[in-house]
Amino acid sequence: MQVSLKNGKVTTLPKVNTIADGTAVKTPGSKIFPYLQKNLDDVITVEDEDLVVAFLDMVENHKMIVENSGLLTVAALKQLNVKDKRIVSILSGGNMDVITMSSVVQQGLILRDRIFTVSVLLPDKPGELCRVCLLYTSPSPRDA
């Protein structure tokens, strides 16, 4: 929508890549566009990283599952100076599969330096996993 508003006409994007899949449209609706063009003051865009943080905040602090598209307003608020102001943010949608939810939580924890992930490909032979464990428990990798 932001590109269409900037261009002054409905514009089709070549691709849309976001975790907010409920709002990921290549071509904005032709019926809503003139209304928004006339009445909208500003458009705020948020990065997927902002949505990940907003999702984790909702889960941890408010015990709510809200899909990424429904969190756009929460993520956008972080870009505005709204401290000590009354704000209404509509949260919607819980249409999120368990795999996506797990991935978003893991990304959020990584962004906050609360966990890290290591992937290792090992030969399928006895003792290989033990060698990797020794690397993590040794004071120096050379000792392993």
Q: What are these regions, as identified by a protein language model?
A:
Residues 136-143:
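Conserved small/polar residues in nucleotide/adenosyl-binding loops
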Residues 1-38, 78-123:
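Glycine-rich phosphate/pyrophosphate-binding loop at beta-loop-alpha junctions
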Residues 54, 132-135:
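Generic alpha-helical secondary-structure signal
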Residues 127-131:
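Short, conserved charged micro-motifs
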Residues 29-85:
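Active-site-adjacent helical/loop segments in soluble small-molecule enzymes
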